[in-house]
Amino acid sequence: MYHSELFQQYGTSYTMRPPHALAPTYPSAGGHHDSYRYSELDVPSQRFDGLFPALEPSQRILGAPPLTPLSLPPGPALGFGQVQPPCETPQLPGNVKMKLENKELWKQFHSIGTEMIITKSGRRMFPQCKVSVSGLEADGKYLLLADLLPVDNSRYKWQEDHWEASGRAEPRLPERVYIHPDSPAPGSHWMKQPISFHKIKLTNNTLDQMGHIILHSMHKYQPRFHIVRAQDVFSRRWGGCSSFTFPETLFLTVTAYQNEKITQLKIQTNPFAKGFREDGMKSKRDRSIRGKRKVISVEQEQEEEEQFQPEGECKRPPLYSGPCDSTLSEELDIGRSLGIPSPNCSFHPITPPTQTPPSTETPNPSLPANQEQGAPLQMSSQTPGTFLQTYPEPPRGASSLYSCSPTDAAQNQTLRPSAQRLPPGYQESPHISHSQGELKIYGTEMGPPGNFNPPSCAVTPSVRLSDEPMGRGFSMNFPHFLPNNKIGLQISGAQLQRMYNGGGWM
């Protein structure tokens, strides 16, 4: 629009210019909406009829309408909880039959009330669905499908010893169809042997992306099987479909078995539950564990009895039990192989009767040099601190307890510890053989208290000359205090100084 007072030369109004006339060869307006057909491209349909026998005549020429998407045969609209009837048209020939192979097993479960476990990750069914078919064309292509339909519109609960309805069912979930992995296959393949649907997995995960069949817990479901002819799969019509159901296969979905009879029946019939049987591996493991526990309890009772036995009847403890097992582990291992006589009761130090030094008497030749004569020592419990307080100073004649000589001191200081051998004055038992790994390290002889120049000295007792206990107050039942043995107690000079100056043991 424009203002008439500004453009007076155009007047108060004006008319539109008429449209230009189109050329006579220009297509009419109807040609813009209808597809243009070139006659030279039209192909006679009868020329290629033999190549496409399954295609419809409307699809054999160019310009035919596009194919519709492939879909299952349409069925009637169903309300909530209504069972979908099997597909009606088209039907396979009436001679196509399906039979449930493990029907007797299903009947056993059905008489009690079959329960199927469902999990988030998916659980297989037992009993499995095993069917056999007959009446198919040997050369025809067929697909076998399976799905699960809700039986009614109720939710169930286990009440004492039976199932009963407890309310309305949950809203129906998207129905999923399980396609047998052998599909499509010729009819001869399906009819030659039973068909198993053991790979079907049930889940309660509504967001499952693994293709498992989604079900609600505590609901009744009915498996349904379909045989679909797949020869004309690219056509707008299916070749035929037949559906089959078996009343014995009805089951309830649970997350844990509610009926104890179902649990026992599945243990007896499921080959994968052999471990739960009385003769199964799980029962054997349980029995073996119970047996081991009994043995352990008996051993514990024996140990408790040994701990409360009197002193005269107590047995020798193991070499690694005692106050010195942490520092003499290697020496005790050597002493075990030397046949050292065992002590009468324990390794605890005894109370010294007197503070007199050991006497020297002629030993009894009828006894070995490394065994005690007379009655066993009376053992009494005493702490190491009390024992050291009794002997603040070394006893008289203590120099005979050490195998160090002044002449060997300088040599031992210059030699490496690995090269220091037994001193010349040491008499070794002829029954004991030498070995490279059983060497002793010796230092020099002890001097007066406080003058301990050598860095270390091996305490080794001299040969006994009397049948009295050597060094009264010293337990001669220790392996490292026995004469003519190969065990040397490595003690540094500073430790010996503190020991005899009253500074405490070690």
UniProtKB/Swiss-Prot annotation:
At gastrulation, expressed in the lateral and ventral mesoderm. Expressed around the blastopore except at the dorsal midline. As gastrulation proceeds, expression extends anteriorly and ventrally. At the tailbud stage, expression then retracts caudally becoming restricted to the tip of the tailbud. SMART domains: TBOX. Residues 276-411 are annotated as: Disordered. Induction: By activin and vegt signaling, both acting via nodal. By bmp signaling in a dose-dependent manner. Fgf is necessary but not sufficient for induction. Residues 276-289 have a biased composition (Basic and acidic residues). It is found in: Nucleus. Residues 369-389, 400-411 have a biased composition (Polar residues). GO terms for molecular function: DNA-binding transcription factor activity, RNA polymerase II-specific; RNA polymerase II cis-regulatory region sequence-specific DNA binding. GO terms for cellular component: chromatin; nucleus; transcription repressor complex. Its main location: nucleus. Interacts with ripply2.2/bowline. Associates with tle4 in the presence of ripply2.2/bowline. PANTHER family: T-BOX PROTEIN-RELATED (PTHR11267), T-BOX TRANSCRIPTION FACTOR TBX6 (PTHR11267:SF100). This is T-box transcription factor TBX6. It comes from Xenopus laevis (African clawed frog). The lineage of its organism: Eukaryota, Metazoa, Chordata, Craniata, Vertebrata.
